[in-house]
Structures are given as structure tokens and as C-alpha cells.
């Protein structure tokens, strides 16, 4: 894959993720957009690691750590959302102010 194509793909994914985080009112959609942002960061890490320093795999190793963090977020996030849904009967972000109660 050409260097510029990978950066453009990463920029598109990151932009879609940021737009989704800003405009979403649903917690599940916000979690999906956060995953898009993390995947865009991984593409950047692997691309720059391959292009600038192909002998040392620092970017690839760091992207594995980001994938592990994303997996933990993917496991814990829906559990938190389902807990909030059980208590509030809604997954809308503006209705889930837990500090009010």
C-alpha cells in the first residue's frame, strides 16, 4: 500500500470517528466511533513504522498495545452501557447523567 493512501484512509476513518463522537446521542454508536478512531491510529502507527523504520518494529508493537486496549474497551464498554440501560431504561447520552441522582 502506498504511504499516502494509508494516510488518507487513516484520516478518513479518524474524521468519521470524530464526527460520530460529536454528533451521536447513543452510547453504542459512540463506542463504535471510538473504535474507528483507534483503528485509524493503528493504521498510522503501522504505516509510519513501516515507512520510516522498517528494521525496528516499535510502531507495530505499540499498535498491538492499542489493539489490546481497544479489546478491553470493547469488552467493558457494552457492559457499562447495559448496566446504565438497566438502571435508566435508555442508552441516550444526554439522559444518562449519573451525578444528578
Curated annotation (Swiss-Prot):
Location(s) in or outside the cell: Plastid, Chloroplast thylakoid membrane
Enzyme class: translocase
HAMAP family: NDH1_NuoK
Catalytic activity: a plastoquinone + NADH + (n+1) H(+)(in) = a plastoquinol + NAD(+) + n H(+)(out); a plastoquinone + NADPH + (n+1) H(+)(in) = a plastoquinol + NADP(+) + n H(+)(out)
Gene Ontology CC terms, in alphabetical order: chloroplast thylakoid membrane; NADH dehydrogenase complex
Transmembrane regions: 2-22, 32-52, 61-81
Major subcellular site: plastid
Gene that produces this protein: ndhE
Similarity annotation: Belongs to the complex I subunit 4L family.
EC code: 7.1.1.-
Function: NDH shuttles electrons from NAD(P)H:plastoquinone, via FMN and iron-sulfur (Fe-S) centers, to quinones in the photosynthetic chain and possibly in a chloroplast respiratory chain. The immediate electron acceptor for the enzyme in this species is believed to be plastoquinone. Couples the redox reaction to proton translocation, and thus conserves the redox energy in a proton gradient.
A biological-process GO annotation: ATP synthesis coupled electron transport
Key words of the record: Chloroplast, Membrane, NAD, NADP, Plastid, Plastoquinone, Quinone, Thylakoid, Translocase, Transmembrane, Transmembrane helix, Transport
Gene Ontology molecular-function annotations: oxidoreductase activity, acting on NAD(P)H, quinone or similar compound as acceptor; quinone binding
Keyword Ribosomal protein appears in the UniProt entry: no
Protein name: NAD(P)H-quinone oxidoreductase subunit 4L, chloroplastic
Subunit-structure text: NDH is composed of at least 16 different subunits, 5 of which are encoded in the nucleus.
InterPro entries, A to Z: NADH_UbQ_OxRdtase_chain4L/K, NUOK/Mnh_C1-like
Membrane topology recorded in Swiss-Prot or TrEMBL: Multi-pass membrane protein
Disulfide bonds: none
